[in-house]
Amino acid sequence: MFLLYEYDIFWAFLIISSAIPFLAFLISGVLSPIRKGPEKLSSYESGIEPIGDAWLQFRIRYYMFALVFVVFDVETVFLYPWAMSFDVLGVSAFIEAFVFVLILILGLVYAWRKGALEWS
């Protein structure tokens, strides 16, 4: 049976690290002056009064680029520890990593064929 008192430092750090941001927001909310006016409600565009609607929508194509980037960024996160311990893991880990990369390459080819990587 494991002993819970061995985790006292962990729980102390968890409580302190959770309390510090909460206290920072609480103290800034209590000490900051609250002045509402028309200037606070206007949108800021480099010190110039906004002309027209200040709302800007992103095209859906940007979403696809971001999604493909996240997939390959996560791939890098998974492959880096594997590459650092490649000599210890052996051939089976190499085959598993190869299958992992192959599945991601198939996904990239599919996205490419569907036109997800074209900005037009």
From Swiss-Prot:
Its predominant location is: plastid
For whether the record's keyword set contains Chloroplast, the answer is yes
Q: Does the keyword Transmembrane helix apply?
A: yes
> What is one cellular component GO term in this UniProt entry?
chloroplast thylakoid membrane
Q: Reaction catalysed?
A: a plastoquinone + NADH + (n+1) H(+)(in) = a plastoquinol + NAD(+) + n H(+)(out); a plastoquinone + NADPH + (n+1) H(+)(in) = a plastoquinol + NADP(+) + n H(+)(out)
What Gene Ontology terms for biological process does this UniProt record contain? photosynthesis, light reaction
Short name of one Pfam family for this protein? Oxidored_q4
Gene Ontology molecular-function annotations: NADH dehydrogenase (ubiquinone) activity; quinone binding
Keywords (alphabetical) are:
Chloroplast, Membrane, NAD, NADP, Plastid, Plastoquinone, Quinone, Thylakoid, Translocase, Transmembrane, Transmembrane helix, Transport
Q: Indicate the transmembrane segments per the record.
A: 9-29, 64-84, 88-108
Which EC number(s) are documented for this chain? Answer: 7.1.1.-
Q: How does it sit in the membrane?
A: Multi-pass membrane protein
Q: Where in the cell is it found?
A: Plastid, Chloroplast thylakoid membrane
Q: What job does the chain carry out?
A: NDH shuttles electrons from NAD(P)H:plastoquinone, via FMN and iron-sulfur (Fe-S) centers, to quinones in the photosynthetic chain and possibly in a chloroplast respiratory chain. The immediate electron acceptor for the enzyme in this species is believed to be plastoquinone. Couples the redox reaction to proton translocation, and thus conserves the redox energy in a proton gradient.
Q: Which family is annotated?
A: Belongs to the complex I subunit 3 family.
Q: Which proteins does it associate with, and in what oligomeric form?
A: NDH is composed of at least 16 different subunits, 5 of which are encoded in the nucleus.
Name of the featured protein: NAD(P)H-quinone oxidoreductase subunit 3, chloroplastic
